Amino acid sequence: MAFRNPMYQLSNVDDIDSEVLNSRFLSETKDDGFSRRRTTLAVCATKKDLYLYGTTPAGGAEWCSEVLERTRPRIAHKRQRRRHVPRWISDSFRTCLPSPSGKWKEQTANEGEGRVKSSWLAACDERIGIAEPTNYWHGIVRTEDDSSKTLYLIPETWEDVHLKEGFVAIIDLAAERLQCSKLILFVDKNLSALSYLVKSLHWVGFEPVPHLDCVDHVLFGMEL
């Protein structure tokens, strides 16, 4: 299934001027006849690095503002092919997501076999992706019955998850840009370092979320 939904690029930047740090702007640019919007979403400062989120166009990733491009001209634009959601991630979301009240039937074609598979998603669900330099997060933003929003996230690998710096920026993105009041992570139960990861998640502020239908993953949540 082609991943054609919003993707957020997390860039590790070590020298951004105050103009970028204070920016909350939206600019319109045209490329090949199409309008694209780029905006600075969230900046997280740590002792050594700055983590900057920016929207990216479908099919590729790029620095999120002209200001940043002028600040770091030596950084080349990074083009990527459109991502595909691995089947195990799709299955995890379909199995572990709470049943919404309003649903719609999503049909996805298997390009290799030409078959169509149907699954149920909430009509208000929004699929997103978060790209880090060494990892990629697949996510769903769900609007609950009380109009609050929850961000569900699952990484392609837990080996390169930066619990301190990366999660602070992800929490900032979820709360400030996506307007979510809760963040829930999917953690593979078969991880060799599961016990250490659980302790680290507790340290960051996550708590286990019971879910009887989730067989291969355990859920951890945080109120934002």
Curated annotation (Swiss-Prot):
This is Ornithine decarboxylase antizyme. One of its GO terms (biological process) is viral translational frameshifting. One of its GO terms (cellular component) is nucleus. Interacts with ODC and thereby sterically blocks ODC homodimerization. Belongs to the ODC antizyme family. InterPro entries: Acyl_CoA_acyltransferase, ODC_AZ, ODC_AZ_sf. GO terms for molecular function: ornithine decarboxylase inhibitor activity. It comes from Schizosaccharomyces octosporus. It comes from the Eukaryota. Ornithine decarboxylase (ODC) antizyme protein that negatively regulates ODC activity and intracellular polyamine biosynthesis in response to increased intracellular polyamine levels. Binds to ODC monomers, inhibiting the assembly of the functional ODC homodimer, and targets the monomers for ubiquitin-independent proteolytic destruction by the 26S proteasome.
